[in-house]
Amino acid sequence: MKYPAFSINSDTVHLTDNPLDDYQRLYLVSVLDRDSPPASFSAGLNIRKVNYKSSIAAQFTHPNFIISARDAGNGEEAAAQNVLNCFEYQFPNLQTIQSLVHEQTLLSQLASSATPHSALHLHDKNILMGKIILPSRSNKTPVSASPTKQEKKALSTASRENATSSLTKNQQFKLTKMDHNLINDKLINPNNCVIWSHDSGYVFMTGIWRLYQDVMKGLINLPRGDSVSTSQQQFFCKAEFEKILSFCFYNHSSFTSEESSSVLLSSSTSSPPKRRTSTGSTFLDANASSSSTSSTQANNYIDFHWNNIKPELRDLICQSYKDFLINELGPDQIDLPNLNPANFTKRIRGGYIKIQGTWLPMEISRLLCLRFCFPIRYFLVPIFGPDFPKDCESWYLAHQNVTFASSTTGAGAATAATAAANTSTNFTSTAVARPRQKPRPRPRQRSTSMSHSKAQKLVIEDALPSFDSFVENLGLSSNDKNFIKKNSKRQKSSTYTSQTSSPIGPRDPTVQILSNLASFYNTHGHRYSYPGNIYIPQQRYSLPPPNQLSSPQRQLNYTYDHIHPVPSQYQSPRHYNVPSSPIAPAPPTFPQPYGDDHYHFLKYASEVYKQQNQRPAHNTNTNMDTSFSPRANNSLNNFKFKTNSKQ
């Protein structure tokens, strides 16, 4: 057995006055009671051997970055091995109570204890309002205090075994989780355990991380014996948990402290990057009831992304593990190119739900747990050895000193340094006096709109010129400019109700306007296109003199013919073949490119003009003809067909 389970005596436990030790303090008091065996600290954890089946069990004992293990893994015996031989134990559970537990009660229990113990710093402010449930004392009253309400009678052991005998392991796991979420009067989830393989040394880090969250949940939410200092103690534990999530493993510049605090308050809020929250209700609610939790609230765990840790910490882990393997096996037995986090990090995704998660080697797991397991350091002695609490406490004190010195100035930094050096100093005052760090700016995402000041600046820079300068550049007369400026000012006025017609009102259409309309109608709004993508705009030609249209001899050239409807000199340019070229030449000149309908329109207009010009010759009074309205005469004048009607 390469990785056995260690034991620790209660007389070697040295706790501090830190509120993070309140859970371990309450458990130690329960263990030291002379009427509540066992007296050993680790004996109350109920360590047992278990076997779990997994398809990747062979990768634990025969990793690909160790040459000797890789060669041994090619045998039939290693290939058939799919069982994980593990040690497993649970943390002692804590049940919330409503009655107050005073300092005198616990001191009297310790005074009657025959087991020697060190200073536990028992004060009302350090006593959690709860009772420890020891595995060996299921039928006895806990030592902390008795609850005011009697507990409901639980099912007997025989009936419970008969009820769960027909269920699979995953069904039992889900049933235990549902039972814990519905009742939820206990702190530790029974499904969370400390598990490690005693053959390969791989540790189930997901279980330790969730047990840490269960304990921190109680330290943050449960009140203390002293109601005055309860809020301060809870605030200190909450700040410590926020610091672990923000600064301990991840890059603290990736998100602000406000975001990490939002995760502590509610799981419905958006979580910071590199951190995912599992399904469940509020994880850390400062206003949660100390005695019981609503049935709708379940344990909510923040998953730890081991691949997203800081690059400096990742390099430290790889180098430390490489040095350990070289010292243990020698450099010839290690395949250095394959020694990377992707290879020594194992993940179980299927099978038994209880062991699904991240598994890491013992050396790496111990290095990571040193950074956050200060509140549970003595509960990890069976897996990491008796030296782990001292190393974890040293790292915590050094880390607290660095953190406080960087976030405080003057007397605050000196007070924090003194508190970090002396374990008997009260840490709560330092945490309360510590100012809140200034939130760091986050990079703006693409979906984020620009700020109001920046948008206003862009609008000012891209503003249009004034209306007066625009009117000056139109090239209008002075009367028109004055009218436009006057009209625009009247439109801006709130008392303006009537509109005045502009002197530049619409006039009768000219021949050019009518020609453009006819061309637009015939072409359906499209321009003519020719081979080689050559565009030839419709050219404007002056109409032939009216005397040519009125001459009978020249009208023969304009006689409508179905075979040749348009004279040759007025044919459409689409009858011409224009050669295509990669470089389009200048458009050739074509004679009067009018269409067929356009030609008939002009012919009709000339006939109307001829009739109107010949009618005064049959009247005695040529200039007194009133058969035509001024509107009609004005339209004929706009056609510009008027000539000398001397025929």
Swiss-Prot record:
One of its GO terms (biological process) is positive regulation of transcription by RNA polymerase II. Residues 138-148, 156-170 have a biased composition (Polar residues). It comes from the Eukaryota. Transmembrane segments: none annotated. Keywords: DNA-binding, Nucleus, Repressor, Stress response, Transcription, Transcription regulation. One of its GO terms (molecular function) is sequence-specific DNA binding. It is found in: Nucleus. Residues 282-395 form the HTH APSES-type domain. Residues 435-445 have a biased composition (Basic residues). Present with 195 molecules/cell in log phase SD medium. This is Transcriptional repressor XBP1. It comes from Saccharomyces cerevisiae (strain ATCC 204508 / S288c). The lineage of its organism: Eukaryota, Fungi, Dikarya, Ascomycota, Saccharomycotina.
